[in-house]
Amino acid sequence: MFWFFFKSGEFFRLKETRAKLIGGGKKLLVPFIVFSFLGYCLNVYNLLKSGDTNWVHYVLTPVKELVLGGSIAGNDVLWFLTSLFMVQIIFNELKKRNVKSWLIVIVAISIAVVCHMFDITKPAYLANVSMGIALYSLGYMLRDIQYDKKIFGVAFAAYIAIMLIEPSHIDLRTNTLNENGCYILALLFSICGCITVNNIFKHIPHLPFLTYIGKNSMDFYVMHMLVLGVITILPWSEWMIPNSVVFGVMCIACLTVPAFIGYLLEHSRYSWVLGKTNK
């Protein structure tokens, strides 16, 4: 997720607050609401199937999950959409007030570091939005100079060195550091990783398959957990299907089902559910 915040920052354009709210709402919040509801329905089915009759788990728990974590069970990976929306709005407001990008990075990272040091995990978006703003600002600042050979060389060397000497990485959603990792090195590792990945993909041939996934990433992102959720409901063990086959089905389904449904939606009046406008 580090890369997605970083990459989004490269495309930042200053806009009026109202335009930013409406545009971000259509592209991010609408898919979040629609596919969170579908995930909620899937989770309700699983709760009923397990015999859970506690109404709290159906009504209050999702609200608590949303308020504290930014998403709900059934499709909880969608936290990124709400966090990115907040990142875009906050960064836009800061730039309207001419706040320096480097200052935004320092303050935002400091907030995330403090959250880590004092184990402040709730609400989760306090840390991940702060980190997201830092990455978004870095993407904006480095959108052109990251492709300088010297900068790429330093970033690549640091990325490999940290990976080999002291592997450190952060779960961006929860701001959790891996065991025996170093938080500062994890930040450096992630930032250098973003620069490295961008440079690699800039110089390799464009592959139609990867290009398609990149252009339709929202389709795959909002649907893949629903696809996996439906697959896990099926009684594979009763059918005596090997786990390796089930895994293969999951992989194929996650690539084909979102693409198929996304195509149908994009060419219908319902393209808005994916944050797209009908062509």
Identify the function of each model-found stretch.
Residues 1-279:
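Alpha-helical transmembrane segments and their immediate juxtamembrane cytosolic regions
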